Amino acid sequence: AASRMYVLTGDPMAELLEVKNLSVSFFTPAGEVQAVRDVSFSLRAGEVLAIVGESGCGKSVLCKSIPHLLPPSARRKSGTIAVNGRDITQLRERELQKLRGSLFSMVFQDPMTALNPSMTVGAQLAAAVRVHAPRLRGAALEQRVLELMRLVGIDRPEERRGLYPHHFSGGMRQRVVLAIALAGDPSILFADEPTTALDVTIQAQILDLLREIQQKLGTATVFVTHDLGAVARVADRVAVMYAGKIVELGTAEDIFYDPRHPYTWGLLQSLPALSRGKPRLHTIPGMPPTLIDPPKGDSFACRNEYALAIDYEEEPPMFRISDTHFAATWLLDPRAPHITPPIGSERHG
């Protein structure tokens, strides 16, 4: 009943999810780790938004903070998270629990640790279905389990529902995890590096499956990854994160063909497919800053070969490049010297 308050408007342009000025910190013996810093973005119904960046940039924390799946050491310091216009940050845990799985659902990195090794996959799927439809029993429940297994591409579900997770390959286990995530017909699916534990050929199959399900069910998806190749395969829009902040946001075409932030340039140049026959892969010098004590000004300045004096003094605002494209770099200020991007002026295929 609680989820009815979040019924989709039917308008494909309506903002299903809107995050504004979100900051999340972890409180540790070493100090306060500012994992997510003043992040804002939106997600439309049926859209795939990829959040990309290096390990430790805050992308997984951002993803888990929306359905309130962070550990006790984490705290939301500021910001709002609205679904269909209603702020969910003030909801109690009991109310949030009703929304998990039905409004939003999560697919985690490692399918083996996400599944119960002592239960058959059919029993685990049935348990997930009954959380959201407790009155569903017998043949109807069995039919729903088989339907979910078919949806994620598991052949011969009648035979395989009686198997245990260890009988399945990594790719098939991830399909089971995805089926469990879809059991409550969620409006938003969070996929936190869902292909990291899989080999390359299986990764491609799972990415294609995610895209196929999104198109079939109209599920909005937030896809967290450090793999730009995966982003190119599935994303409609891309948010590039660095040191707890979104530094560039745009359509996949904006980011791949017209990147504006020097960090995005570095990420794209490091892709083997874009090395243009050079004997050495491009690397970004230095290390990301500590988020216990973020530097003054632009956090990327010390690694940025195009850094201006102001980068070390003042944090750049988010500059608007077009209706769909935004980047936080002083190079976009009208007073900045003109820099020709080292990448992005041609189609990369």
Identify the meaning behind each predicted range.
Residues 75-87:
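Conserved ABC transporter NBD signature motif
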Residues 86-87, 139-159, 268-269:
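Conserved ABC ATPase "signature" region
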Residues 68, 190, 194, 198-279:
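P-loop NTP-binding/switch modules centered on Walker-like glycine-rich loops
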Residues 183-187:
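A short, proline-enriched helix->beta-strand linker immediately N-terminal to the Walker B motif
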Residues 52-53:
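The feature captures the beta-strand-to-loop junction immediately N-terminal to the Walker
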Residues 155-161, 249-349:
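Short catalytic/signature loops enriched in Gly
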